[in-house]
């Protein structure tokens, strides 16, 4: 604090020198606030006027003007000019230590472009060299007068360059919303720097608030205002637009087609590709039609070409231009003829190949026997001819058999069926064949059977009555019955029409009373069973 106090005690009061600058700033701010309610078009034009007037004070050298123009392209033109003015004022009014702190705060708190701190220290060093001299008042007064006199000369050039840059920036902001949004971010940074540096000069607060209000517009408002200002430049009566009609026309032509399209660039690119593909497909479809149309054109124009050639031979020096056109047309027709002949040749070749594929094998077989050696020592010529005839006859028969579709289809079917059978099918076939063989054996046996003797009903009734007569007639009938019973069990068992009494007697006689088992006796030789 003691250091700052010592410096402030030896400091000269610059209120007299600052009063002129503050009065100029107040006049500018009053003019701005009086016309805030005007249209946005006029407001933007007035802002550009103020910018141009302030740049006249700023630019002291040609190098500095070029750097300022580059910075105006990167940022909107209203704000950096006022930043530079306020920084120069603060550099004159503050001591070295406070100035260095202020510059450090500005560079760290606000991310300003690199070109700003390179430009400010030059002005600061000039102020320091002239600040602590013997004639302080005269040096400061002369310096300000020198700055004003220098700024009066390049002001016109600066106005032109800034006007061009401003038009370019407005057109670029209207072309894409992304660039306008990035521009709005830089505007906010510049507005913050203005509000931070305005503590040293309180008279410039009102003008800076107005400028920051303009810069804090949304991207859409900027887009609209930029278009309106560029469109109304030719009709306005401001001296700047009147002095540069060519630039205003250029800006109108640049901005007029920048309305937002209905189709995105990717979709339009895809549509263009699709249209190109359609055109290619149509060209490919019309190739054959064009070829045949060219044939007709050649036929129709052949007479004209002949006449043109004759006329050319007669009037070569007189008709040079006509002959050149006829030559061009004849060359085109020759080229088309060549293409047509090539296509026709290809068609003929394809047809010939197809015919050879169909008829080639037969011709090949028939042509081979004709190619024979000139001399054959094993056979005479007559024998060789007979052999050739026989071979040709055999080849014809083989070719006929090969041409028949039935012969090819039947042979592989008979050969292919057995291996396709599965084991289950084979087992079924074997079982079926075995059953068929047994049935055939039984059928043969049944066919070989003959009717047995005495199996008729009349014969059995006669036997029954005869046996009954034997039993009733004599006492020795029991023996006879027993003997008859021994021979008659087979008959009684086989006849279903016999009576129950006879069957009971035959069964009793056949059963042994001691053992209870039937006694089997040898069969008579004349009796035969049906199943043997």
From Swiss-Prot:
Q: Which UniProt keywords apply?
A: Coiled coil, Phosphoprotein
The biased composition feature labelled Polar residues covers: 50-63, 227-239, 253-263, 493-503
Segments of this protein annotated with the region Disordered? 28-83, 116-263, 306-333, 398-421, 485-532
Record-listed Phosphothreonine modification sites: 133
Disulfide pairs?
none
- Xref: InterPro entries: Cfap97/Hemingway, Hmw/CFAP97
Q: Where is the composition biased (Low complexity)?
A: 170-185, 194-205, 320-329
**Protein family per UniProt:** Belongs to the CFAP97 family.
Q: Which organism is it from?
A: Homo sapiens (Human)
Coiled coil (UniProt feature): 374-450
Identify residues that carry Phosphoserine.
19, 138-139, 218, 248, 330
Q: Where is the composition biased (Basic and acidic residues)?
A: 35-49, 67-82
Name the chain's protein: Cilia- and flagella-associated protein 97
């Amino acid at each position: 604090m003691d250091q700052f106090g010592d410096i402030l005690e030896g400091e000269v009061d610059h209120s007299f020198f600052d009063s002129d600058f503050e009065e100029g700033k107040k006049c500018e701010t009053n003019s701005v606030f009086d016309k805030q309610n005007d249209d946005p078009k006029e407001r933007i034009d007035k802002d550009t006027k103020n910018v141009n007037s302030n740049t006249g004070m700023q630019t002291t050298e040609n190098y500095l003007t070029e750097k300022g123009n580059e910075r105006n392209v990167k940022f909107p033109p209203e704000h950096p000019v006022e930043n530079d003015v306020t920084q120069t004022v603060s550099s004159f009014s503050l001591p070295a230590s406070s100035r260095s702190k202020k510059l450090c705060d500005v560079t760290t708190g606000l991310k300003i472009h690199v070109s700003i701190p390179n430009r400010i220290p030059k002005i600061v060093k000039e102020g320091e060299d002239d600040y602590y001299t013997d004639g302080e008042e005269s040096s400061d007064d002369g310096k300000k007068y020198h700055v004003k006199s220098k700024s009066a000369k390049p002001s016109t050039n600066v106005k032109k360059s800034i006007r061009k840059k401003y038009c370019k920036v407005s057109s670029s902001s209207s072309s894409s919303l992304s660039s306008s949004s990035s521009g709005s971010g830089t505007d906010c940074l510049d507005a913050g720097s203005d509000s931070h540096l305005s503590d040293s000069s309180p008279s410039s607060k009102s003008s800076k608030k107005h400028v920051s209000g303009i810069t804090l517009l949304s991207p859409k408002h900027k887009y609209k205002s930029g278009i309106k200002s560029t469109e109304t430049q030719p009709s306005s009566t401001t001296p700047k637009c009147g002095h540069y009609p060519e630039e205003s026309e250029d800006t109108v032509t640049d901005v007029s087609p920048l309305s937002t399209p209905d189709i995105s660039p990717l979709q339009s690119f895809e549509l263009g590709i699709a249209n190109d593909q359609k055109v290619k497909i149509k060209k490919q479809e019309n190739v054959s039609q064009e070829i045949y149309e060219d044939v007709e054109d050649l036929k129709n124009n052949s007479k004209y070409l002949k006449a043109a050639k004759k006329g050319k031979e007669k009037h070569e020096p007189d008709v040079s231009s006509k002959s050149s056109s006829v030559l061009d047309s004849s060359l085109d027709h020759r080229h088309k003829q060549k293409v047509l002949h090539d296509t026709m040749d290809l068609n003929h070749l394809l047809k010939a190949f197809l015919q050879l594929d169909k008829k080639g094998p037969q011709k090949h077989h028939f042509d081979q026997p004709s190619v024979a050696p000139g001399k054959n020592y094993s056979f005479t010529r007559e024998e060789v001819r007979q052999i050739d005839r026989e071979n040709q006859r055999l080849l014809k028969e083989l070719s006929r058999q090969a041409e028949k579709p039935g012969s090819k289809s039947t042979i592989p079917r008979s050969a292919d069926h057995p291996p396709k059978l599965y084991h289950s099918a084979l087992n079924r076939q074997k079982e079926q064949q075995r059953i068929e063989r047994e049935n055939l054996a039984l059928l043969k046996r049944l066919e070989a059977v003959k009717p047995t003797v005495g199996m008729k009903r009349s014969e059995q009734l006669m036997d029954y009555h005869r046996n009954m007569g034997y039993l009733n007639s004599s006492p020795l009938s029991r023996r006879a019955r027993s003997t008859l019973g021994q021979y008659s069990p087979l008959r009684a068992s086989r006849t279903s029409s016999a009576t129950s009494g006879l069957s009971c007697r035959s069964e009793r006689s056949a059963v042994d009373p001691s053992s209870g088992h039937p006694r089997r006796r040898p069969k008579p030789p004349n009796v035969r069973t049906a199943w043997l």
